[in-house]
Amino acid sequence: MESTPKKAPRSKFPALLVVALALVALVFVIWRVDSAPSTNDAYASADTIDVVPEVSGRIVELAVTDNQAVKQGDLLFRIDPRPYEANLAKAEASLAALDKQIMLTQRSVDAQQFGADSVNATVEKARAAAKQATDTLRRTEPLLKEGFVSAEDVDRARTAQRAAEADLNAVLLQAQSAASAVSGVDALVAQRAAVEADIALTKLHLEMATVRAPFDGRVISLKTSVGQFASAMRPIFTLIDTRHWYVIANFRETDLKNIRSGTPATIRLMSDSGKTFEGKVDSIGYGVLPDDGGLVLGGLPKVSRSINWVRVAQRFPVKIMVDKPDPEMFRIGASAVANLEPQ
């Protein structure tokens, strides 16, 4: 009877190798998750502005439609310019009339100035005559007691002195009148400066009646049409700044230790998860509103009672700037996935 050969014992090395590789893979995954944080709690965003007219008026031209892309300098809408054109014409007419008034007044002042120069010469002459008459009277009066002059001579000297003083006062009044005429032109020149400022302001208002795109963007929330009266500083629609797109990714606070400004990131949008976009961390949020109370700004801390022993890590927003965003894919609020590659 033949004996059956015994089977050789199987080596345990392959199984141990598989287990070892699995452990290495597990350690790598854990390390990778810890050092390269990722989150699907993210969304695309961009800066926006409210497009508001700086002057009031009726919209006579609306050059855009809702969700339309625009370039910097493109016409958005135009407010009826006629009231501002009328104000400008009125101000310019006032300036022309004032210039003519200044010219005529200047001619009169020039004539009065010429007369004032003559009056000044007359003033000096009258002042000299008054001084001479006063000196003559002062010398004549003592001679009356000595009998060298008669009382009639003294009266004539006194009359001459009074007449000279009267002539001096008269020419002094003429000089003051000439000086006041010159100051009248200064007032008109100051008034002209005010009219010029009014013209500049009216031109600015006329320019503001035409509203153009301040940057490349996309129009949203447009709910008006031609004929609508637009009030100054009241928004007409919103304009998205499409020059710079970013993703707000909410990471757990335990991941923040590996995140720095400039950390490379890979972005995927839910609308096309097969396409990736490169970016870099711009900044990390430093404040969120706690869901369970916490510190109330401007008051006392409010701490809710809890018997929950499980603490869930808080999430903080991380702003990631996208290098080359696809303008057709990126929309404010679009769901995204962010993967960081700390260096």
From Swiss-Prot:
Cytoplasmic side: 1-12
Keywords per UniProt: Antibiotic resistance, Cell inner membrane, Cell membrane, Membrane, Signal-anchor, Transmembrane, Transmembrane helix, Transport
Segments on the Periplasmic side according to the record's topology features: 34-343
TM regions (residue ranges): 13-33
Domain of life of the organism encoding this protein: Bacteria
Subcellular location: Cell inner membrane
Keyword Cell inner membrane in record: yes
Induction profile: Induced by LeuO, part of the mdtNO operon.
Cysteine-cysteine disulfides: none
A GO cellular-component term linked to this record: transporter complex
GO annotation (BP), single: response to antibiotic
Cited InterPro entries: CusB-like_dom_1, CusB_D23, MFP_Efflux_Pump, MFP_proteobact
Molecular function in Gene Ontology: sulfathiazole transmembrane transporter activity; transmembrane transporter activity; xenobiotic transmembrane transporter activity
Chain coiled-coil ranges: none
Family of the protein in this entry: Belongs to the membrane fusion protein (MFP) (TC 8.A.1) family.
Described function: Could be involved in resistance to puromycin, acriflavine and tetraphenylarsonium chloride.
Protein name from the UniProt record: Multidrug resistance protein MdtN
Species name: Escherichia coli (strain K12)
Lineage, top ranks: Bacteria, Pseudomonadati, Pseudomonadota, Gammaproteobacteria, Enterobacterales
